Amino acid sequence: MITVTFFWVGIVLGAIWTFYRVVLYPYRVSPLRTLPQSQRGHWLWNHAFSEFLQPIGQLHAELLLQIPNDGMICLRGLFGAPKILLTSPKSLADVLVHRADDFEKLPGERKILRAVVGDGLVTAEGDVHYQQKRKLLASFTPPKIRALYPVFWKEATALTQQIRRTLTHDGSGIYTGTTDMVYWAPRVSMDMIGAAGFGQSFHSVRDVDSEIIHCYEKAFAIGAGHLLCVFADTLLPRIILQWLPWPRWRQFRQNIDSIQDFCHQWVTDAKATSALGDGIPSNLLANMIHTGEYTFQELIEQVRTFLAAGHENTSSVVMWVMLALASDSELQSRLRQELQASLPEVELDKVDLAILEQLPLLNAVVSETIRLFPPLPIGNRIAIRDTTVMNHPIPKGTPFLIVPRAINRSSELWGPDADRFNADRWINPDTGRFNNHGGASSNYSFLSFFHGPHNCIGQNFARAELRTVVAAVIRSFDMVLDNPAADVSPVGWFTPRPADGVKVKLRSLV
């Protein structure tokens, strides 16, 4: 009888606790209850899965403009659980910079990233992150990046030469044809990070059967089935997955293991070269080894991280910048004139390619592409202690959404043409020089590389890659879209790309 009584007491207490946590606390007690709330969620799970809706970040961009707010909007997940959408430079500055130590990536997100891109800088937090970034900064100084321009240019010109080989010669020295830049973008990005990052010659551009490219295409495939593989690989014990009749997961795991093996071999090669003491370090990995501050396994993890970040992110932006230029013949012509004036065909080998950093329109095109199409369209943080944002109390465990796609396209921050590709916003009309703000009033209006301690350490490396690819392609070809009516909506969860690809008609120029 006593056992039965305790059972029912437990049931009643559990029901009371559930009612308090699900109904009373979120809407009557929590300090977050006074924030503007979204009413657009699903009737059952509210906004619990809003981060996965395609295009990524589009819903949040709409909420940002539709719901009056002072910098934060409270979205609700399962059972009324809060999720705070940051919407203003002030709230972003608090989370990313002023109180950065109070926030970390979600544990689940870090676990997924660790499985896919390695246990490097991207997944590190706290003092571990500080120490890793401190050691890595020496490899990403402006002089070190400028020294890599000849490497980038070599790979970019290899791209244009290989594209030319796929075109048809008309007998008068002109090559014409159609190609899809979605095919070429990951290959040239892989070759660039291979050469400049690790001292490796992948030849992905000319090798149709490039093993490293195939591994990455399969490991980072687009689709819900692939995303399920990533979650399962992260959340379920390997011994259970190995017994399941799931060929797709096995292929995913095999590709991730192959990438790990590649990284192991590259580090082995680089350390052997370093031991010979032959010359000044000429790539990122060689610079890291030269410091003597890394163990062998730490080098492997950082290489995995930089391979994923340096390849996938750059590849995505290359696709979008080619789409933008192929869609605007006038902009393309202006850019070509600027490039031809600064990079004459005669004695090009004697030109300091770092001059690309000084070209206003080239840098404007690159910045505008990164603004409109950030490689990472959404990110998460969680409060690891009780804190405040814009003087508003935030309980420990509160998750936050940081959505570069929404912030970068906010008409309140970028003006009425925020959704339109307008490279000229990055050029001062009075001087004709490049500016680094695009007309926005705050640097937090541009979130593509985030800000603060966790900003992207490789952003200048990525910009240098993009400058050289754009310069090489636009100097070599005239481009127009093969099908202007094609669907160019962003698809994919990690690094979105145009849904129907970037099919362009090319005509050789040099």
Curated annotation (Swiss-Prot):
- Single biological process term from Gene Ontology: mycotoxin biosynthetic process
Q: What is this protein called?
A: Cytochrome P450 monooxygenase PC-21
Which is an annotated Pfam family here?
Answer: p450
Q: Name one GO molecular function term.
A: oxidoreductase activity, acting on paired donors, with incorporation or reduction of molecular oxygen
Q: What does this protein do?
A: Cytochrome P450 monooxygenase; part of the gene cluster that mediates the biosynthesis of the indole diterpenes penitrems. The geranylgeranyl diphosphate (GGPP) synthase penG catalyzes the first step in penitrem biosynthesis via conversion of farnesyl pyrophosphate and isopentyl pyrophosphate into geranylgeranyl pyrophosphate (GGPP). Condensation of indole-3-glycerol phosphate with GGPP by the prenyl transferase penC then forms 3-geranylgeranylindole (3-GGI).
State the membrane topology: Single-pass membrane protein
Predominant location category: membrane
The protein's location, in the record's own words, is: Membrane
User: Which keywords does this Swiss-Prot/TrEMBL entry list?
Assistant: Glycoprotein, Heme, Iron, Membrane, Metal-binding, Monooxygenase, Oxidoreductase, Transmembrane, Transmembrane helix
Provide the binding site for heme.
456
